[in-house]
Amino acid sequence: MADLTKLMKGPTEAEPVQEQPKLSREEYAAQKKAEREELWTRIDALTADVFKDGSSLRGFLDFTAQCSPERIENLLLFHSDAPEATWLKTFDEWKQAGRSVRGGEVGYTALIGQDYTREDGTAASGYYVGKKFDVSQTRGRQPNRAPVYAADELVTAVFTNSPVRLAVSEAVPEGIQAQYAAQNRTIYVRNNMDAQTTFLAIAREQAAASYDIHDGRFSRAAYSAQSYCAAYVAAKKYGLDVRSFSFDRVCQMCSGLEPQEQRRFLSDVKQAAYTVERTVRRGLNEMELSATPEPACSVEVHASMEQTERPARTKKASQPQRE
C-alpha cells in the first residue's frame, strides 16, 4: 500500500522522545562515585606530570603564583584545563560577588567544598564535583593588573609585618643569607645584601617558620625543599627575577613518592607561599597608609566650622494669620 504520510495535509507527528530512565537513589550514588573515582585517577596523573622534570614543576608553581587561592587538587585541574585563569569561583559565588557569568561559557571541573549534616545530626564537611568559572568569563570590568613593586619595597614590607621576629646579624653562617632559629623563633638575616637576595632569603625562612608548630621537634632540613619552592611562588607573585631557581633536585626527591604524598608536598608549598604573600601584602598596605598624607581637616570639621562662623539669623516676627 502507498505511504499514508503523503496523504496527510498537516505536518506529521514527531516521534515520541524516549525519556531517560530515572535512576534510583542507589544507582545515582554509584554513578557519582564512579565520576569521582575517574576524576581522582586524572588528578593522580596530573600530579605525576608536575614532578616529571624541573620545567614542569616550575610551570605549576608559576600557575600557583598566578591563580587565586585554591585547594591543591583544583590547582592541578585548572593548570591543565585553564592555564590562563587567575580567579575562579562557582556560578553562585560570582553572583554573590556581584558579577554574572556570560551566557554560553563552560565552567572548569573542580572539587567544591560543602558543609552538610549527617543522619545523626552532627555537622560535617565534604566536597562535590562541580564547575568553576574564571573572572574572564564574567560580565563587568576586569580586575586591574597587580602593581609592580621594587625589591627594596618588598623587603620593607616583610620587615614591617613579619609574623616571626627578624634580626640583622653578622653571625649568620658563611654562605647563608638568612636562617630561622626555632629555639627563639627568630629569623637572622645577613646585612648589606642586595634587595632581591634579601627578600628571597627572608621569604624562604618565613616559609620554613610557618611549618614550626612549636612542639620542640621542628627540623629545618625536613622543610628545605618546600620552603625553597614557596619562596619561588612569592617572588614570582611580586614580579621578581626568578631565573636562578632550579627544581631538578626537588623533582628527584619527590619522584618516588605516592601521588597523595606528592600532593601533600605541593599543598605544604602552597600554604607556606600564601603565608608569605599575606605578610607582604599587609606590609605593603601599611606602607601605603603611612605614605598617604592626612587631610588638613575632615569634611565634618569643615562643616562644623562653617556652622560656627556663620552669623546667627534673627528670628522673624510671626505674621498674623488671616481670619
Could you describe each region identified by the protein language model?
Residues 2-323:
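N-terminal accessory/interface modules of nucleic-acid-binding and processing proteins
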